[in-house]
């Protein structure tokens, strides 16, 4: 899938005036492209508001990051669970009306999650870096910043907010971007979870190398439908290369029951990322315990 990083004819702002020459192809072609275009604008605005040097000063005062990958590898129950703090999504709208990220994070920690994932996109997922800060202050588990990362600046934002790991989405990044952002994340002590959706992206990531944690998103990026067979197919096709590189595989999206977890674990997934299934539970902790202990 091709993702154009910016509209072909972006608007230009001079003083209080904004203008652009009309263009037939200036609308995003699908939701992911729409998110990426908006994210580019958000990054520019964030840089103006909080300069990079300010983030570096905040980071200098923080303790070392927690071992996200190590926590997954050491999980007492398999597959290890990354539980997601998620209020909404573009495909489902608001998932949890009574969204209390601190209470949810504490429930996940008590329920046996190995790590947590926190959505930081405001526009489409109603998350935020402020949510990540709140969760960091509430729990000791390793935290993944779930964001549409396009710029190294966002890695500094994630680290300053308390993240231990960051998501890199292969579909929206070039090979050069993936290499550079992986190195930049490592320099900040951040673990990278690189996400793929199909065989082309998996081949790219494995060819680049240096990614011990790879996520397979079972959601089709154009239809937003989920299919756990995506994890099964990619693990069959790339099993040897994944083993050679010592990759821990995370299955993401479409996981709602212990049977789903057992299915992707049988295929070779060492961890799962579960969000919506838990967010819709009246008792989040009990829902997670049931999901983990049923195995």
Curated annotation (Swiss-Prot):
Coiled coil: none annotated. It catalyses: 1-(2-carboxyphenylamino)-1-deoxy-D-ribulose 5-phosphate + H(+) = (1S,2R)-1-C-(indol-3-yl)glycerol 3-phosphate + CO2 + H2O. GO terms for molecular function: indole-3-glycerol-phosphate synthase activity; phosphoribosylanthranilate isomerase activity. It holds the Pfam family IGPS. The keyword Amino-acid biosynthesis applies. Its EC number is 4.1.1.48. Keywords: Amino-acid biosynthesis, Aromatic amino acid biosynthesis, Decarboxylase, Lyase, Tryptophan biosynthesis. It comes from the Bacteria. It is an enzyme of class 4 (lyase). One of its GO terms (biological process) is L-tryptophan biosynthetic process. CDD domains: IGPS. Gene3D superfamilies: Aldolase class I. Pathway: Amino-acid biosynthesis; L-tryptophan biosynthesis; L-tryptophan from chorismate: step 4/5. InterPro entries: Aldolase_TIM, Indole-3-glycerol_P_synth, Indole-3-glycerol_P_synth_dom, Indole-3-GlycerolPSynthase_CS, RibuloseP-bd_barrel. Belongs to the TrpC family. This is Indole-3-glycerol phosphate synthase. The lineage of its organism: Bacteria, Bacillati, Cyanobacteriota, Cyanophyceae, Synechococcales. The gene is trpC.
């Amino acid at each position: 899938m091709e993702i154009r990083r910016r509209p072909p004819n972006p608007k230009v702002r001079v003083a209080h005036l904004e203008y652009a020459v009309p263009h037939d192809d200036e609308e995003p072609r699908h939701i992911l492209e729409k998110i990426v275009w908006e994210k580019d604008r958000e990054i520019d605005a964030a840089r103006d508001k909080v300069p990079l040097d300010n983030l570096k000063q905040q980071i200098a005062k923080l303790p070392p990051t927690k071992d996200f990958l190590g926590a997954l590898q050491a999980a007492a129950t398999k597959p290890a669970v990354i539980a997601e703090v998620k209020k909404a999504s573009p495909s489902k709208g608001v998932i949890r009306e009574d969204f209390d990220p601190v209470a949810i994070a504490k429930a996940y920690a008590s329920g046996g999650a190995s790590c947590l994932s926190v959505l930081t996109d405001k526009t489409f997922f109603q998350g935020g870096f402020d949510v990540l800060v709140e969760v960091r202050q509430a729990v000791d588990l390793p935290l993944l910043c779930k964001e549409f990362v396009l710029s190294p600046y966002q890695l500094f934002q994630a680290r300053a907010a308390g993240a231990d790991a960051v998501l890199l989405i292969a579909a929206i990044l070039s090979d050069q971007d993936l290499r550079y952002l992986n190195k930049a994340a490592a320099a900040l002590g951040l673990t990278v979870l690189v996400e793929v959706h199909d065989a082309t992206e998996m081949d790219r990531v494995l060819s680049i190398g240096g990614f011990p944690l790879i996520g397979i998103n079972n959601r089709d990026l154009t239809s937003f439908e989920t299919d756990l067979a995506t994890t099964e197919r990619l693990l069959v096709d790339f099993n040897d290369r994944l083993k050679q590189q010592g990759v821990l595989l995370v299955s993401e999206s479409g996981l709602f029951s212990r049977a789903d977890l057992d299915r992707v674990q049988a295929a070779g997934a060492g961890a799962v990322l579960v969000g919506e299934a838990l967010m819709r539970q009246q008792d989040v902790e009990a829902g997670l315990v049931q999901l983990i202990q049923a195995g």
